[in-house]
Amino acid sequence: MLYRIARAGIFKLDAEKAHDLAIQNFKRFNGTPLDIFYRQKLVSKPVEVMGIQFKNPIGLAAGLEKNGECIEAFGAMGFGFIEVGTVTPRPQAGNDKPRLFRLIEAEGIINRMGFNNLGVDNLVENVKKAKYDGVIGINIGKNKDTPIEKGTEDYLICMEKVYQYAGYIAINISSPNTPGLRTLQYGEALDDLLSQLKEKQKELAEKYGKYVPIALKIAPDLDDNELSQIADSLMKYKIDGVIATNTTLDRSMVEGMKHAEEMGGLSGRPIQTRSTEVVRRLKELLGDSLPIIGVGGVDSYVAAKEKMVAGADLVQVYSGFIYKGPNLIRDIVNNI
């Protein structure tokens, strides 16, 4: 009820201004009596995935907590894990504004943010300071001005810097808002990236005496042959997990709605069915060889359960959280 009242005011603001205001307030309220508006104690639903113990299988997807500024606040809401980022080697401003749009009637969001972030060094400092007893995943990407043929270098730089502070590392090669990025999902480019990531993981595991899993985040806009090739590469290079899916470029499910023609990736309820189909197909292709983190349109415990029945070991929320608030986490955890 409280969130519904707050949302009415928040949704009168520009979407990005509302996001920035929320982050500022979470930072300001955390640890004060005002955090009662979002703090909630949930039942424990522990699960082990990628060799990591999660206190529950519901996580915050990357993109909302880009710089790791208020990890404790999201932890207080009951998330079993929080994925921060996407972060790049160097700070970057991202794409021109406006770049974030609500499709309220569809409970969707279109973004063309472009990996705006304060850089990997800033993120690492925030993660080091965070007092959160859950799992922190760190989502890494490449800078916009790094040529795509040198993109792997950016991932390796980020991986080296975040490794000892991450519960797991997510490799984002599926954002539609960085030119050329999605080409890394295919053929030799993917194999070269995964090969070098695994080599770096082995080197860092020996250096720090701990094994940090890596998970590949893929797009929903892949046909069956492309999914099959990705699955083969994931197994070939013994990648620890796959995150399905990122946002879509498809607009067929929101045609005619306000903001539907905006460039960028569409998330939320409109991609619920497609992302679940990708999870199901990946499960058929991968079997039990590696776990799947399902994300895309998870806006209720029913939607979360559908992802898990399709084959997801963990699920993440983003757009559903924007529309439903912290109670969404409680509803999913209590009923999953």
UniProtKB/Swiss-Prot annotation:
Pfam families (UniProt xref): DHO_dh (PF01180)
One cellular-component annotation, GO: plasma membrane
Membrane topology: Peripheral membrane protein
Keywords per UniProt: Cell membrane, Flavoprotein, FMN, Membrane, Oxidoreductase, Pyrimidine biosynthesis
Major location (coarse): membrane
Location(s) in or outside the cell: Cell membrane
Enzyme type, top EC level: oxidoreductase
Molecular functions per Gene Ontology: dihydroorotate dehydrogenase (quinone) activity
Reactions mediated catalytically: (S)-dihydroorotate + a quinone = orotate + a quinol
One record GO biological process: 'de novo' pyrimidine nucleobase biosynthetic process
Binding site for substrate: K66, N111, R112, M113, G114, F115, N172, N177, N246, T247
Pathway(s) annotated for this protein in UniProt: Pyrimidine metabolism; UMP biosynthesis via de novo pathway; orotate from (S)-dihydroorotate (quinone route): step 1/1
Cofactor: FMN
InterPro entries: Aldolase_TIM (IPR013785), DHO_dehydrogenase (IPR050074), Dihydroorotate_DH_1_2 (IPR012135), Dihydroorotate_DH_2 (IPR005719), Dihydroorotate_DH_cat (IPR005720), Dihydroorotate_DH_CS (IPR001295)
Cofactor note: Binds 1 FMN per subunit.
Binding locations of FMN: A62, G63, L64, E65, K66, T86, N139, N172, K217, T245, G268, G297, Y318, S319
SUPFAM superfamilies: FMN-linked oxidoreductases
EC number: 1.3.5.2
Disulfide bridge map: none
PROSITE patterns: DHODEHASE_1 (PS00911), DHODEHASE_2 (PS00912)
Function: Catalyzes the conversion of dihydroorotate to orotate with quinone as electron acceptor.
Family: Belongs to the dihydroorotate dehydrogenase family. Type 2 subfamily.
HAMAP family for this protein: DHO_dh_type2 (MF_00225)
Quaternary structure annotation from Swiss-Prot or TrEMBL: Monomer.
Protein name (Swiss-Prot/TrEMBL): Dihydroorotate dehydrogenase (quinone)
Origin species: Aliivibrio salmonicida (strain LFI1238) (Vibrio salmonicida (strain LFI1238))
Gene this protein is translated from: pyrD
